Amino acid sequence: MDQNLSGLDCLSEPDEKRWPDGKRKRKNSQCMGKSGMSGDSLVSLPPAGYIPSYLDKDEPCVVCSDKATGYHYRCITCEGCKGFFRRTIQKNLHPSYSCKYDGCCIIDKITRNQCQLCRFKKCIAVGMAMDLVLDDSKRVAKRKLIEENRVRRRKEEMIKTLQQRPEPSSEEWELIRIVTEAHRSTNAQGSHWKQRRKFLPEDIGQSPMASMPDGDKVDLEAFSEFTKIITPAITRVVDFAKKLPMFSELTCEDQIILLKGCCMEIMSLRAAVRYDPDSETLTLSGEMAVKREQLKNGGLGVVSDAIFDLGRSLAAFNLDDTEVALLQAVLLMSSDRTGLICTDKIEKCQETYLLAFEHYINHRKHNIPHFWPKLLMKVTDLRMIGACHASRFLHMKVECPTELFPPLFLEVFEDQEV
C-alpha cells in the first residue's frame, strides 16, 4: 500500500504540473465527444434523495467537486466517492490500483472513474478515514446497535408520553370510588367466583329441542336453568345503576329506558370477564359455569358465540374491578337509546365517566399498545350483543312456553327496538 500511496505529494502541486504532456485531458475530451454522455454524467446529476441541513447549498465533494450529499468517513463527499472509498477498503482493492500517468491525475466528476489510484489517493489526502469503514461483521453489529437504540428511544418516548398523560383529579377519584363500590356490592361472588361456581351438568343442553324459525333450536331444560338466575342478575344491574349519583338525578322515564337498553350488555360484560380458558366456560351471575354450546342451545344462539368471543379477547386486557365498573357506567349512560328525554344531560354524564375512565387508564399504565382505544371498541361489541339479543328474544318468546319467562325478564326485554 505504501508504494501505491507514494505519489500523494504531487496533489499539492499546481494543476498545470499534474498533466506533464496534456494527453490525459485530451483523452477525457475525446471520450465525451464520442458518446455525448459518459457513465459519470449520470452520477453527476444532483441526487434526488435527502440532503442534510448542515450542508451549504450545492456544497461540492472534496474529492471530485460533484454535489456533496453528506459527511462520509470524516469528509464531505458525494455518494459516488463515498461508495468508491467504502468498496476499496472493504474489498482491499487499493493494492491492485495503478496509474498510467505517474499518479498525478486531476480528479473531478468527469475524470474520477478513469484512474482509481489517483481517486483513492485524493480520498486519503482530503482526510477520508479508512478506520471508519466497517467490515461485514462490524456493519451488522452497528445496524443491530442502531436498531437497539431505536427501540430504546421508542420505549423512553412511550414512558415519557405516559407520564405526561393526565391522571384522575380528586373529584374524579371520588367518582371512580363510588362507581367501583357500586359494582363490587352488586357483583355476585366478587373475586371468589371461581371457588364458588357450579358447572352446569354436561347432559343439560343436549336434550330434545324445540325448533326455532331461524333454524336454531332451544333446549328447554337449559333455558329453564338460565331463567332461574336471570331475575337476580337483572336486579343486580338495576341496583348498580341506582348507586350512581348522576343516574339518580335523571327522570324515572329516562332511567327505565337506559336500564332496558344496557341490561343485557352489562350482564354480558360481567359474564365475559369471568371467562375461564382452562375449562372454556363463562360463569353466569357469579354461580353457574356454562360451555359455549350449552349457552347457545339454552336460547341465546349466535349471541352465545359473541359473548364467548368477547370473554376470550377481554382476558388479554386484565381488567380490574374499577375498569369493569367504569365500562358498565359508560354503557348505562348511552344517550342514543330510543325515547330518551334528557339526551344532552345523559351525554354529559357519559362524557364525565369517559374522561374519568381514560384518566384511570393512564394511571394504570397498561403494557398493551393503544389500550384505551382498543378497550373502547369493546363498548361497540357489547352494544352489538345487546342488539342481537333483542332480536333473539323475539324468537324465544314465540317458541318457548310463556310460563318459563320470569316477569322481570319480560318487563326488561319486551318492547325493545330491534
Curated annotation (Swiss-Prot):
Segments of the chain annotated as binding DNA = 61-128
Record keywords: DNA-binding, Metal-binding, Nucleus, Receptor, Transcription, Transcription regulation, Zinc, Zinc-finger
UniProt GO BP: cell differentiation; negative regulation of transcription by RNA polymerase II; positive regulation of DNA-templated transcription; positive regulation of transcription by RNA polymerase II; retinoic acid receptor signaling pathway; thyroid hormone receptor signaling pathway
Give the start-end ranges of region Disordered. Answer: 1-40
**Chief place of localization:** nucleus
Q: Which residues belong to zinc fingers classed as NR C4-type?
A: 61-81, 99-123
Q: What is known of its domains?
A: Composed of three domains: a modulating N-terminal domain, a DNA-binding domain and a C-terminal ligand-binding domain.
Q: How does it assemble?
A: Binds to thyroid hormone receptor element (TRE) weakly as homodimers and monomers, but binds TRE with much higher affinity as heterodimers with retinoid X receptors. Can bind DNA as a heterodimer with either rxra or rxrg.
Chain's role: High affinity receptor for triiodothyronine (T3).
Q: What is this protein called?
A: Thyroid hormone receptor alpha-B
